[in-house]
Protein backbone atom coordinates (compact mmCIF):
# COMPACT_ATOMS: atom_id res chain seq x y z
CA UNK A 1 0.00 0.00 0.00
CA UNK A 2 1.18 3.50 -0.80
CA UNK A 3 1.85 5.82 2.17
CA UNK A 4 -1.15 7.90 1.10
CA UNK A 5 -3.31 4.95 2.10
CA UNK A 6 -4.89 4.43 -1.32
CA UNK A 7 -4.75 0.65 -2.02
CA UNK A 8 -3.87 0.83 -5.72
CA UNK A 9 -1.60 3.86 -5.48
CA UNK A 10 1.68 1.96 -5.03
CA UNK A 11 0.99 -0.17 -8.09
CA UNK A 12 -0.06 2.84 -10.17
CA UNK A 13 3.13 4.74 -9.31
CA UNK A 14 5.42 1.77 -10.01
CA UNK A 15 8.00 2.40 -12.72
CA UNK A 16 7.47 0.30 -15.84
CA UNK A 17 9.69 -0.27 -18.86
CA UNK A 18 8.19 0.15 -22.34
CA UNK A 19 8.21 -3.67 -22.56
CA UNK A 20 5.74 -3.93 -19.68
CA UNK A 21 8.24 -5.06 -17.05
CA UNK A 22 8.19 -3.22 -13.75
CA UNK A 23 11.46 -1.97 -12.33
CA UNK A 24 12.03 -3.56 -8.93
CA UNK A 25 15.50 -2.02 -8.65
CA UNK A 26 17.53 -0.06 -11.14
CA UNK A 27 19.76 2.95 -11.69
CA UNK A 28 16.91 5.31 -12.58
CA UNK A 29 16.99 7.41 -15.70
CA UNK A 30 20.76 7.91 -15.60
CA UNK A 31 22.50 4.64 -16.38
CA UNK A 32 25.66 3.41 -18.04
CA UNK A 33 27.98 0.47 -18.19
CA UNK A 34 27.93 -1.28 -14.85
CA UNK A 35 24.27 -0.39 -14.19
CA UNK A 36 22.08 -3.22 -12.91
CA UNK A 37 18.34 -3.88 -12.97
CA UNK A 38 15.88 -6.27 -11.45
CA UNK A 39 12.80 -6.31 -13.65
CA UNK A 40 9.57 -8.07 -12.75
CA UNK A 41 6.75 -9.45 -14.80
CA UNK A 42 3.50 -11.21 -14.07
CA UNK A 43 5.19 -14.62 -14.06
CA UNK A 44 8.70 -13.96 -12.72
CA UNK A 45 11.70 -11.65 -12.84
CA UNK A 46 14.94 -10.87 -14.69
CA UNK A 47 18.26 -9.74 -13.17
CA UNK A 48 20.53 -8.01 -15.68
CA UNK A 49 23.56 -5.74 -15.84
CA UNK A 50 24.94 -3.59 -18.66
CA UNK A 51 28.49 -4.96 -18.66
CA UNK A 52 31.60 -2.86 -18.67
CA UNK A 53 33.39 -3.68 -21.93
CA UNK A 54 36.35 -5.17 -20.05
CA UNK A 55 34.03 -7.86 -18.61
CA UNK A 56 32.09 -8.61 -21.80
CA UNK A 57 32.90 -10.85 -24.74
CA UNK A 58 31.60 -8.06 -27.02
CA UNK A 59 31.14 -4.33 -26.32
CA UNK A 60 27.64 -3.05 -25.50
CA UNK A 61 26.48 -6.26 -23.83
CA UNK A 62 23.59 -6.80 -21.44
CA UNK A 63 24.39 -9.74 -19.19
CA UNK A 64 21.35 -11.64 -17.99
CA UNK A 65 22.34 -12.99 -14.62
CA UNK A 66 19.07 -14.74 -13.90
CA UNK A 67 15.59 -15.32 -15.28
CA UNK A 68 13.27 -16.86 -12.72
CA UNK A 69 9.73 -18.03 -13.44
CA UNK A 70 7.44 -18.53 -10.45
CA UNK A 71 7.38 -22.27 -9.61
CA UNK A 72 3.62 -22.66 -10.13
CA UNK A 73 3.87 -21.10 -13.62
CA UNK A 74 6.74 -23.11 -15.09
CA UNK A 75 6.43 -25.23 -18.22
CA UNK A 76 3.91 -22.93 -19.92
CA UNK A 77 6.17 -20.68 -22.02
CA UNK A 78 6.47 -17.89 -19.47
CA UNK A 79 10.29 -18.06 -19.45
CA UNK A 80 10.33 -17.48 -23.20
CA UNK A 81 7.98 -14.49 -22.89
CA UNK A 82 10.04 -13.04 -20.03
CA UNK A 83 13.25 -13.46 -22.04
CA UNK A 84 11.75 -11.81 -25.14
CA UNK A 85 10.72 -8.80 -23.04
CA UNK A 86 14.26 -8.67 -21.59
CA UNK A 87 15.68 -8.75 -25.12
CA UNK A 88 13.52 -5.78 -26.15
CA UNK A 89 14.63 -4.00 -22.97
CA UNK A 90 18.27 -4.64 -23.96
CA UNK A 91 17.68 -3.15 -27.41
CA UNK A 92 15.97 -0.11 -25.90
CA UNK A 93 18.92 0.69 -23.63
CA UNK A 94 21.35 0.40 -26.55
CA UNK A 95 22.81 -3.07 -26.01
CA UNK A 96 24.04 -4.88 -29.13
CA UNK A 97 24.60 -8.26 -27.47
CA UNK A 98 23.16 -10.38 -24.68
CA UNK A 99 25.45 -12.68 -22.74
CA UNK A 100 24.45 -15.48 -20.35
CA UNK A 101 26.02 -18.32 -18.43
CA UNK A 102 23.64 -21.25 -18.76
CA UNK A 103 23.04 -24.27 -16.59
CA UNK A 104 23.59 -27.48 -18.60
CA UNK A 105 19.88 -28.34 -18.66
CA UNK A 106 18.97 -24.93 -20.15
CA UNK A 107 21.48 -24.81 -23.05
CA UNK A 108 18.82 -26.15 -25.45
CA UNK A 109 16.39 -23.39 -24.46
CA UNK A 110 19.01 -20.68 -24.99
CA UNK A 111 20.02 -22.21 -28.34
CA UNK A 112 16.35 -22.02 -29.40
CA UNK A 113 16.40 -18.35 -28.41
CA UNK A 114 19.30 -17.77 -30.84
CA UNK A 115 22.28 -17.96 -28.47
CA UNK A 116 25.57 -19.60 -29.44
CA UNK A 117 28.22 -21.05 -27.17
CA UNK A 118 31.35 -18.92 -26.78
CA UNK A 119 33.76 -21.68 -25.77
CA UNK A 120 34.83 -19.54 -22.80
CA UNK A 121 34.42 -20.54 -19.18
CA UNK A 122 33.48 -17.89 -16.65
CA UNK A 123 31.70 -20.06 -14.06
CA UNK A 124 32.43 -23.73 -13.41
CA UNK A 125 29.68 -25.99 -14.66
CA UNK A 126 28.03 -23.29 -16.79
CA UNK A 127 28.07 -22.70 -20.54
CA UNK A 128 28.85 -19.15 -21.68
CA UNK A 129 26.58 -18.06 -24.55
CA UNK A 130 25.95 -14.86 -26.53
CA UNK A 131 23.38 -13.48 -28.93
CA UNK A 132 23.62 -10.49 -31.29
CA UNK A 133 20.46 -8.39 -31.05
CA UNK A 134 18.93 -5.45 -32.88
Region annotations inferred by a language model:
Residues 1-26, 73, 111, 134:
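Charge-dense, intrinsically disordered terminal/linker segments
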Residues 33-34, 124-128:
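Short hydrophobic/aromatic beta-strand or adjacent loop that forms the aromatic wall/cage
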Residues 90-102:
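Conserved GNAT acetyl-CoA-binding A-motif
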Residues 111-121:
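Conserved acetyl-CoA-binding loop of GNAT-fold acetyltransferases
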Residues 99-108, 122-126:
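Conserved beta-strand-loop-alpha-helix junction that forms the acyl-donor binding cleft
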Residues 10-59, 65:
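Acetyl-CoA-dependent GNAT
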Residues 69, 75-88:
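Conserved acetyl-CoA-binding loop-helix of GNAT-fold acetyltransferases
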Residues 65, 108-112:
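Acidic/histidine-enriched, beta-strand-rich ligand/metal-binding domains
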Amino acid sequence: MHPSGAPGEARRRRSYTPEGLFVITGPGESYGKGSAWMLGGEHGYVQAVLLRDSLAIHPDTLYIENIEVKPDRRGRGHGRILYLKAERFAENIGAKWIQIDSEAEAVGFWSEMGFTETGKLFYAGKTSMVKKIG
